[in-house]
Swiss-Prot record:
One of its GO terms (cellular component) is cytosol. It comes from Rhodococcus erythropolis (strain PR4 / NBRC 100887). Its cofactor is heme b. It is found in: Encapsulin nanocompartment. Its main location: other. SUPFAM superfamilies: Dimeric alpha+beta barrel. Keywords: Encapsulin nanocompartment, Heme, Iron, Metal-binding, Oxidoreductase, Peroxidase. Belongs to the DyP-type peroxidase family. This is Dye-decolorizing peroxidase. One of its GO terms (molecular function) is metal ion binding. The lineage of its organism: Bacteria, Bacillati, Actinomycetota, Actinomycetes, Mycobacteriales. The keyword Heme applies. Its EC number is 1.11.1.-.
Length: 341
């Protein structure tokens, strides 16, 4: 009996530090990237061994366009580009991204070392197009002051929420992840009274208690991001969001990263937020927080990365024959000269 595939460490508890790296693969860099991906678990072990209590964990995601450039064979059933959304007032853009590295640890030096080594290994084959350094903000709060990730599943429920099952047997044990970088208008947000902020989020700010359905505004964040199946059971995702910021430029926000067994769950959440449910009833948080990136990735198992399928054979164009330019003769003299040589 075959053992189940070992997943990547996406169920690692939230940490104090994180780095999010998004790469695009350079033309002709596919084989080099393919080779680096097979070394990721070894790099994680080697760097993490230097600080055993540091909790270094790295998750690799592969984008829709990159998959066919890197691997022969089957393709994940639900892997597709990010679905761009344009509502009456707010927009969720689709942005480039072939590789995601979600790097976490209890201390930033481990994250930084791993990010540096991977980036150096990929030099000349892939280019960093987005880099975000996240940090824990007090008791898992975002920069808006609210606890983030309260409704995350745990234990077996978390495993079920993020793990592809028998519906796609070639990739059982894998996951999907959607990332977006949000920039906050902190001046505008901080101008709101706490009571109004709580109406935007749908939770109390200090106690982190969700409002009851009779009190919660229909356009609050919590009202629009609960997804239920046909029987009324909530379908969950795992959020590993992290705050980030630059004080000098006042650029600060939240890096949203949502793992799930199917991207359709997160996509429905985003549709509710940007388009509205019903249409026009968009998430009020978007009046203060702007999405500037949006990418879908597939997270294969650790076993897949350790021993990936071969890279596709690059087709070499067949040599073409170019007829000589005719001078109007039959070339008989040339044939005679050839015969005489």
């Amino acid at each position: 009996m075959a053992l189940p595939a070992i997943p990547q460490p996406l169920l690692t508890p939230l940490t104090e530090a994180a780095i999010f790296l998004v790469f695009t693969i350079d033309e002709g860099g596919e084989q080099a990237v393919h080779d680096v991906l097979a070394d990721i678990s070894g790099l994680q072990r080697s760097i993490g061994f230097r600080v055993p209590a540091g909790g270094l964990a790295a998750v690799v995601g592969i984008g829709s366009d990159a998959w066919d450039r890197l691997f022969e064979g089957p393709r994940p059933a639900e892997l597709h580009p990010f679905v761009e959304l344009t509502g009456d007032k707010h927009h969720a853009p689709r942005t480039p991204g072939d590789l995601l590295f979600h790097i976490r640890a209890r201390q930033m030096d481990l994250c930084f070392e791993f990010a540096t080594v991977v980036t150096n290994r990929l030099a000349g084959a892939a280019s960093v197009i987005d880099e975000v350094h996240g940090f824990k903000y007090f008791e898992q709060r975002d920069l808006m002051g609210f606890v983030d990730g309260t409704e995350n599943p745990s234990g077996q429920a978390a495993y079920v929420a993020v793990t592809v099952g028998d519906e796609d047997p070639d990739f059982a044990g894998s996951s999907y992840v959607i990332v977006q970088k949000y920039l906050h208008d902190m001046s505008e947000w901080n101008s709101l009274p706490v009571e109004e902020q709580e109406n935007v989020i749908g939770r109390s700010k200090l106690e982190d208690l969700e409002m009851d359905d009779d009190t919660k505004p229909a356009n609050s964040h919590t009202a629009l991001t609960v997804i239920e199946d046909e029987s009324g059971e909530q379908i969950q995702i795992l959020r590993d969001n992290m705050p980030f910021g630059h004080v000098g430029s006042a650029e600060m926000g939240t890096y949203f990263i949502g793992y799930s067994a199917s991207p359709t769950v997160t996509e429905q959440m985003l549709t509710n937020m940007f388009i509205g449910n019903p249409v026009g009833n968009y998430d009020r948080i978007l009046d203060f927080s702007t999405a500037v990136t949006g990418i879908n990735f597939f997270v294969p198992t650790a076993d897949f990365l350790d021993d990936p399928p071969d890279a596709p054979t690059r087709l070499v164009p067949e040599a073409t024959f170019t007829a000589p330019i005719s001078d109007g003769s039959l070339g008989i003299g040339s044939l005679k000269r050839s015969a005489q040589q």
